[in-house]
């Protein structure tokens, strides 16, 4: 329902703001601290929480609910530029590519259930608000782009819904701590609000879905 969905989004944003405030203090005191660098490249391994209890999603692919693969593994790559600072906020612009996958093979004791594969890919620009200095900083960011979400049970490999571009809003936050002059440990918690798809071949449309992805890895400046 729209009201419930809006409350969920507000709750998530407030949680991210509290996280950013918690980690926004400088990593170590310096006078003066270095500014946030002009650019950063991120490379993260990620864990997407693919839904495994969404009957509408299963129906859109002509699947049983128990066939949905669920949690998977992925990769996030990002490039961000930081051209402008105003008081305590450094503004950033950039982009992110996120890819992830999951596989599920049911036990042999459940013959009606089919093996299934799940693939997700998102590409989007991002605007970020950054708090901290060049030794370490936290951020809130978001953007609008497109994604493709393929959920393929065995025997239904040629499904138009798996190749349908879906408008997707991503929003989240994270932090970077520089453990060496040019290398940082970084993490990111991101939500992908995926628009509903179209109905194909007599199957219902895929529902509006929010996918959460947690990533961690390195950043290079």
Predicted features, each with a name:
Residues 1-36:
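Cleavable N-terminal export/targeting peptides
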Residues 125, 142-146, 164-175, 189-191:
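Hydrophobic alpha-helical segments of small multi-pass membrane proteins
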Residues 31-36, 52-56, 63, 171, ...:
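Predominantly the C-terminal beta-signal and adjacent terminal strand-loop region
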Residues 53-61, 103-112, 150-159, 197-204:
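Outer-membrane beta-barrel translocator domains and adjoining extracellular loop/strand segments
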Residues 47-75, 164:
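Surface-exposed strand-loop-strand hairpins of Gram-negative outer-membrane beta-barrel proteins
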Residues 47-49, 73-155, 209-221:
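Gram-negative (and chloroplast) outer-membrane scaffold detector with strong preference
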Residues 39-46:
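Short, hydrophobic/glycine-enriched beta-strand segments
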């Amino acid at each position: 329902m729209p009201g419930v969905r809006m409350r969920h989004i507000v709750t998530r944003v407030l949680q991210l703001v509290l996280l950013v405030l918690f980690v926004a203090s400088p990593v170590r005191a310096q006078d003066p601290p270095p500014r946030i660098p002009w650019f950063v490249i991120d490379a993260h391994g990620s864990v997407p929480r693919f839904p495994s209890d969404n009957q509408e999603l299963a129906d859109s692919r002509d699947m049983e609910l128990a066939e949905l693969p669920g949690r998977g593994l992925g990769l996030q790559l990002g490039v961000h530029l930081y051209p402008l600072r105003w008081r305590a906020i450094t503004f950033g612009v950039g982009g992110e590519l996120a890819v992830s996958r999951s596989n599920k093979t049911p036990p042999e004791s459940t013959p009606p259930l089919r093996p299934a594969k799940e693939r997700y890919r998102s590409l989007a620009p991002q605007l970020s608000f950054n708090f901290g200095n060049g030794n370490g900083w936290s951020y809130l960011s978001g953007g609008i782009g497109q994604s493709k979400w393929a959920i393929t049970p065995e025997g239904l490999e040629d499904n138009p819904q798996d190749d349908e571009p879906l408008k997707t809003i991503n929003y989240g936050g994270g932090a970077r701590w520089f453990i060496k002059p040019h290398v940082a440990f970084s993490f990111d918690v991101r939500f992908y609000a995926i628009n509903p798809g179209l109905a194909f071949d007599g199957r219902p449309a895929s529902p509006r879905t929010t996918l959460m992805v947690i990533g961690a890895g390195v950043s290079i400046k």
